[in-house]
């Protein structure tokens, strides 16, 4: 139940489209060929188009309370159903930071109808799995079960978020569990670096706070804090009941009306708007020469989920790619940065990232280096960023587009990832974006678009930097900023 970022999901029918072309391109590409092989290709294209059209529809219904019910029926014998709530650590303040994550821990500790033991036995006897996670903007509770047990799964989820007892004894017990979890997180240097990155990039704002909250808050959060958070944020318009697998939308809708129809209240007036989180180019350095490797993240401000430039930044992120010493390929890797890194033995690993929130985001790279190669690796990274702004080629962009589409489809394999994709997209876009539409938007990105968008968000922009470990060789912040617009070899 550790804090996690929201994931994406898809389904078996989509796996048949790993080539990644849109319908229109497939049909247009086959048209005009009159040879025997051309006719065969045309028949194959028509069959492939039917596969695309047979992808199950995502049905969406909004109840009077504002609760959105969304589902995709793929006829499987299992299903995943969950509640996606527009409430995470960003909705907290300094005093109650950590409450959303604390609530996630309390979800399975008993309700007015079920003790913790009863809840665990019921889930086990169903052969189901019950889980939850918290991110900076969302809280999720979901269950994976047999399709025939969908009614019981929905009833249990409704019971958990509406009738949790939040007993004092359980609160004290979970307080200790969360403190131990915090100790585990502090040993994961990647999580530590990303928390530092948010803290410096969004300093003095809600996104700058951690999901778990500070130790003093964990020790002081009370039952009243938990109840107040539920009362304030668990409102109908901010909740999505999503399901995928062997689910009937009509049945799910009836279950939603029965279990949530009259109990979820709405906001008086408009849903409260999130205060903006201002990005600040800055740095955090935690030097520890006893550590064997330096861990560093550098990022510029990106855009929110619904921004038109999001897709282009996703392609740019794929262009940079990721690399680890365990990878093969060497100079034959598709990522130019991976080639340079491998050839120069500059780092142990690097991973590009594009983290989006409602109205802002972070686009950057995380790397793990030897102390002596930190400066050289950062220099190569920034040089590659500048190349995206000036001279990226069409062949590179085409390869990145195909890789992005493939990865996108591979992540949507099974009812759980599909359900997560539905829930997340309903909160972010208030709709499920069809795969052909998403592929068409990716295919619209070319080298010129990459250069324009990267110049807009990367060139001459002040980055946020978080570095931990033996970082004596890391250039000063002024030098790093100057390399965002001009580099001397």
Curated annotation (Swiss-Prot):
The active site is at 104 (proton acceptor). The keyword Membrane does not apply. Zn(2+) binds at residues 101, 105, 181. GO terms for molecular function: metal ion binding; metalloendopeptidase activity. Its main location: mitochondrion. Its cofactor is Zn(2+). It is found in: Mitochondrion matrix. Binds 1 zinc ion per subunit. The keyword Acetylation does not apply. Residues 1-45 form a transit peptide. It holds the Pfam family Peptidase_M16. GO terms for cellular component: mitochondrial matrix. Heterodimer of PMPCA (alpha) and PMPCB (beta) subunits, forming the mitochondrial processing protease (MPP) in which PMPCA is involved in substrate recognition and binding and PMPCB is the catalytic subunit. Belongs to the peptidase M16 family. Catalytic subunit of the essential mitochondrial processing protease (MPP), which cleaves the mitochondrial sequence off newly imported precursors proteins. Preferentially, cleaves after an arginine at position P2. Required for PINK1 turnover by coupling PINK1 mitochondrial import and cleavage, which results in subsequent PINK1 proteolysis. This is Mitochondrial-processing peptidase subunit beta. It comes from Pongo abelii (Sumatran orangutan). The gene is PMPCB.
